[in-house]
Amino acid sequence: MRIVGIIPARYQSSRFPGKPLVDILGKPMIRHVYERSARAGCLDRLIVATDDARIAAAVAGFGGEALLTRADHASGTDRLAEAARLLELDGADIVVNIQGDEPLVNHRMIEALVEALQCDRHCPMATLAFPSESLQDYNNPNVVKVVLDRGLRALYFSRAPIPFVRDGAADAPAFLKHLGFYAYSASFLQTFSRLPPGRLEGLEKLEQLRALEHGYGIRVALSPVDTRGVDTPEDLEAVVPVLAQDAVGA
């Protein structure tokens, strides 16, 4: 069994075109993601899956491995599934989905994610969550929340404030902020990519709900650190000072 980290990265973005190559402290963002992810001791291989030759060339330029995929994928998960097929992974291999716009990724997050998948044979995929009490995040529909059962399996993901406090407390309850990193068995990744989208997925615009709607369990690991993705130039401004303090993701 191999554990392969795949970083889906596309050049076109409606809110921030070319963001994988945007300079952060002298390096393209994709290099920060790659080098910080490479510190995860559990990974046997790390690859950037992209539809853009410029991104592939940038990755090769700093000594990383890149794989060109089709440009017509509807989601990063579909790109991931194609990459896994091109790599001819065994069904028992583990694929870790590391977002290409997460320059604050920490190797301990990846290690916790892989451990969670390996320890629960009833769940073919795993993801991460970070405990929070931020009222702003609790009420922000762009911050996805997750609730768990007692076995640390996801009951539901939502953009709405969950768990909802019926009695209207002024402060946010302790909740779990979902972090969009995933690990799958390679065989389930192909199964997932072929599943038809579900109604809840369509309403919430959350792809992971597809697994729950089709009856597949998702194990959730508590991340040792929080992170922040880069969707806009404003997000980039916020992550630069954090990276300046922790350039290697110690």
UniProtKB/Swiss-Prot annotation:
A GO cellular-component term linked to this record: cytosol
Gene Ontology molecular function: 3-deoxy-manno-octulosonate cytidylyltransferase activity
Subcellular localization(s) per the UniProt record: Cytoplasm
EC number: 2.7.7.38
Major localization listed first in the record, in broad terms: cytoplasm
Domain of life: Bacteria
Role: Activates KDO (a required 8-carbon sugar) for incorporation into bacterial lipopolysaccharide in Gram-negative bacteria.
Name used for this protein in its record: 3-deoxy-manno-octulosonate cytidylyltransferase
Gene source species: Syntrophobacter fumaroxidans (strain DSM 10017 / MPOB)
Taxonomic lineage from the root: Bacteria, Pseudomonadati, Thermodesulfobacteriota, Syntrophobacteria, Syntrophobacterales
